[in-house]
Amino acid sequence: MAMNIRKTHPLIKIVNNSLIDLPTPSNISIWWNFGSLLGLCLIIQILTGLFLAMHYTADISSAFSSVAHICRDVNYGWLIRNTHANGASMFFICVYLHIARGFYYGSYLYKETWNIGVIILVLLMATAFVGYVLPWGQMSFWGATVITNLLSALPYIGDMLVQWIWGGFSVDNATLTRFFTFHFLLPFVIVALTMVHLLFLHETGSNNPIGLDSNMDKIPFHPYYSYKDLLGFFMLLLLITFLALFMPNLLGDTENFIPANPLVTPPHIKPEWYFLFAYAILRSIPNKLGGVLALAFSIFILLLVPMLHTSKQQSLIFRPITQILFWLLVANTIILTWIGGQPVEQPFIIIGQIASITYFSFFLILFPLAGWWENKMLKL
């Protein structure tokens, strides 16, 4: 009897082993949907971005008007642009929930998968940042100026590095052109790294909510989780469609409706909402270099999480003290996001500084201590 083609064909069997016959823990919850949702977000962003790039002009004299042209004159251009802009927000919501899931259930102990994930996050942030510059509105221009200028804090090479990135002595046409190039290129690098992410994940198999070995009780991915993922797809598409059609400008900045003007500074320069927590940490430190290092460390601290794991248990499901700390960290990050969007004045300055200190304390001190304490309590 001939073998099934999906198990023998060199190309199809890769798909089969990844999406059809993949042995999956039988008890993974809705929190495990976000990986596939991120894949869907990436596909949506690449497709809508491709159509936008067909009509966009990467030149400072016509970038703003080309975006207006897309919205006014291109067939369904307004829908493509709104989907792309709000798709980015949904992408980051899914990313942060995906990271929070990995943190809560101890998935970071799969070190290769986790570390590749952190690299993907950094590239995603870079892609979103350069993409935000492309419409060439006020916040695009000043956001690019302020954030790239942070590199000048690096000793010796800083000023040279900033001018090299700008392609001149200020944010100008050369900057816009190269940012468009990077914005087009980086998503494909992210696709490649996603493949590596999945490769390492399938080496170990998925984690599960209780953090115990699930080899004795696994089920095929299809049909169980493929249909479960489809439900997530419909919910995500519904949310993106609702945002794009009913509230397209809800998460954007009104300053970006004004064409870029190097002679007029907006009253409050701030990035998109998904970077505000890191921006608040940057602003909390009066020293420029210190702020830049804190900004970088606020993301790269995720690489230290596997090394700082002190508990004998993988998941937080049976660790009440660490659970409380986890939700306090979530609340702390929300406070930082709020502070990042506020003007630099009291009481926001001191709240931001306290929230920044506690953010790092959770990772470096409180979680390791709680894990150690819970180990002691297990022996009682």
Swiss-Prot record:
Main location: mitochondrion
GO cellular component annotations of the record: mitochondrial inner membrane; respiratory chain complex III
Pfam family, one: Cytochrom_B_C
Cofactor note: Binds 2 heme b groups non-covalently.
GO MF terms held by the record: metal ion binding; ubiquinol-cytochrome-c reductase activity
Keyword Iron: yes
Keyword Heme: yes
Ligand binding (heme b b566): 98, 197
GO biological process: mitochondrial electron transport, ubiquinol to cytochrome c
Transmembrane regions: 34-54, 78-99, 114-134, 179-199, 227-247, 289-309, 321-341, 348-368
Bilayer topology term: Multi-pass membrane protein
UniProt keywords, alphabetically: Electron transport, Heme, Iron, Membrane, Metal-binding, Mitochondrion, Mitochondrion inner membrane, Respiratory chain, Transmembrane, Transmembrane helix, Transport, Ubiquinone
CDD domains documented for this protein: cytochrome_b_C, Cytochrome_b_N
Compartment(s): Mitochondrion inner membrane
InterPro entries: Cyt_b/b6_C, Cyt_b/b6_C_sf, Cyt_b/b6_N, Cytb/b6-like_sf, Cytochrome_b, Cytochrome_b_C_euk/bac, Cytochrome_b_N_euk/bac, Di-haem_cyt_TM
Domain of life: Eukaryota
Residues binding a ubiquinone: 202
Subunit record text: The cytochrome bc1 complex contains 3 respiratory subunits (MT-CYB, CYC1 and UQCRFS1), 2 core proteins (UQCRC1 and UQCRC2) and probably 6 low-molecular weight proteins.
Protein task: Component of the ubiquinol-cytochrome c reductase complex (complex III or cytochrome b-c1 complex) that is part of the mitochondrial respiratory chain. The b-c1 complex mediates electron transfer from ubiquinol to cytochrome c. Contributes to the generation of a proton gradient across the mitochondrial membrane that is then used for ATP synthesis.
Additional notes on this entry: Heme 1 (or BL or b562) is low-potential and absorbs at about 562 nm, and heme 2 (or BH or b566) is high-potential and absorbs at about 566 nm.
PANTHER family, per database record: CYTOCHROME B
Protein name: Cytochrome b
Species per Swiss-Prot/TrEMBL record: Maculabatis gerrardi
Gene symbol of the encoding locus: mt-cyb
